[in-house]
Amino acid sequence: MSEEPLPGPRCWFAANLGWLRDPAGYHARQRQRFGDPLGGWLGRLRLALTGSPAGVRQVFAAPLDTYAPVGVDLAGMLGAEALPVLEGAAHLALRRRVNAVLLEGEAAQAGPAILAIARAEIAAWPRGRAMPAGPLLQRLSFAVIMRVVFGVIAPGRAEAYRAAFARLARHAGIGLVLLPALRRDLGPWSPWRRFLEARATVHRLIAEDLAAARASSDAARFDTLARLAALREADGAPSLSDAAIRDTLVVLLSAGHESTAAAMAWALLHCWATPGVLPRLRAELDGCDGAAASLLRLPFLEACAREALRIAPVAPMMVRQLARPMTLAGHDLPAGMLVGASAELAHADPAVFPEPEKFRPERFLDARFRAHEFFPFGGGRRLCPGARLALEEIRLVLAVLARTPGLALADHRPPRRVFSGPLLAPSRGGPRILLQEQAT
């Protein structure tokens, strides 16, 4: 076993800058040069990054006491009781409760609501002019996650949330994660002050609705907020603190709509731009009655959604921090070092996905990929609780898009993949589309 530092770039600043400039290609080039696992950096913390099936499996399957809370100040951004911040027993306990709520509440019955929202939103899109699809899909996806979290909500209240989260997204750049110096309040125009003010607005809105849910006696409510607020211990005390519910909802509302909207934008681009895919998808849809349950059983529709998540993973890596030493692929890693499973590298492995640069949905019809080969929503104990809902939403929205008359790409040039907060999204607002005027 090697006791030498992992091969990789030595300068933390240059490594972070290279990743920021080219998040989709930087680590692939570094791995080609240095091998797997790759030594790298996240901020000023050393990182061991792997995309090999064996390495990813080891990262995901490590015992519970292997990891500690990540030294990057995620708590300062997401909240001290957010799922991505917690480790060990606290993480497992919150995860079980959130999973139970998402599997039994509004999220478990969201299919018809997603279809209704998608049809209404897409019917209102402007016609006769080219426009970026990204903002339109973000609005649609935010409407879906609002329905899941809050149920039916007054339009004015929904718009207040939309504006608050849009402001939060503008000020929660990846630079705040990578560069600790930016997380200082230097006055009204400093990045950290603007982030804190945007987050305070979001927290205030959630606190108001949480207080109303705590005081409500409506047992018929099945929205996520109401069900989290209603959880009780054996002695009748609330299972979750207000802070835990608030931090959980911030993650669900922000990551839940931004990541799904980005995935839908890539699915739209590739399905419309890849010869043969859209006709095959429409033929499959023509044989379906259009109900949500029926659409969710269509194999090629699901394959298109999964291939979009493979070719352009929205979350480029899943990172943990070692609480104790680990040996990864023959390299001894010390406690305190970060280890990451890279979806970016794993999803482009030609040994697992032949011709990985090509959009080929049929690969998901011909084979079943294991959890350490295809993991767009994370893996192991860190699998995203909203994974099932997100995949359903991508499929149902893609079905509505494919059935929308006159929808075409206005520009076949693919956008670049760039950071939007900690996630990767299409540049320039995503693919440009054109909805032709309807004949009268």
Regions picked out by a protein language model, each given a short descriptive name:
Residues 1-93, 108, 113-120, 155-156, ...:
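N-terminal membrane-proximal hinge/A-helix region immediately C-terminal to the signal-anchor transmembrane segment
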Residues 14-35, 291-329, 350:
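Conserved cytochrome P450 K-helix E-x-x-R motif and the immediately C-terminal K′/meander segment
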